[in-house]
Amino acid sequence: VIVKADTQIERTVTGKDGKAAFTSDLPLGQYYVKEIEAPKGYVKSDKIFDVDASYQGDKVKVIEFKAAFENAPIKVEISKTDITGEKELPGAKLSVIDADGKLVESWTSEAGKTHMIERLPVGKYTLREESAPYGYKVASDVTFEVKETAEIQKVSMKDEQAVGKIVIEKTDKVTGKPIEGVVFEVRDKDGKVLDILTTDKNGHAESKELPICTYNEDGTFKEDIHYTVVETKAADGYI
């Protein structure tokens, strides 16, 4: 036995043209060629090509062998939806950042469409929302890890609908001192009472969380919501 089985005889790296050549002077025998590392952003091929380098007669001085390896690109599909996870939201400005803090890619989300990034090297990344669509809260960062697989890797980020509060500070017109016990009603455009507020000793009152706008069926902004605040009971000694 001249060469022990499974001994690595030669290792080479492809050039810009995707080609590589082995030039070792091999003893006669059986060999195989396989890929041991794929380019960054690609999946390593699992193909193994057998090479028959047995004696083929005294007229054959050089045995040539060609093998073609194909590498599938690593793909990451990024979904930007509302909290239900059913509607792809437009208008979100998103970025993917690598483990060193370097910007990899940035884009603006589109209605009904996910975003695909191809040839993303294996490693850890952060999906960041730079600004949310109107009517939505900016989501927290999402960290994810890209693995070496030909399957599409999916990353999702969800936006909650934006809400607001009505804040009241009630003071004496003359003295500027806070007034306690004043009652207010928060009403919608149809006059329906949505909340009742009473000022505390600091003259402060605030409503529950209220939606700030309505949305179309695809989750996009439709129109702002307007509320009316009506004082229904004054404090003792006030009109």
Task: Cite the ranges covered by each PLM segment.
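Solvent-exposed loop/turn and edge beta-strand elements of beta-rich ligand-binding domains
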Residues: 1-239
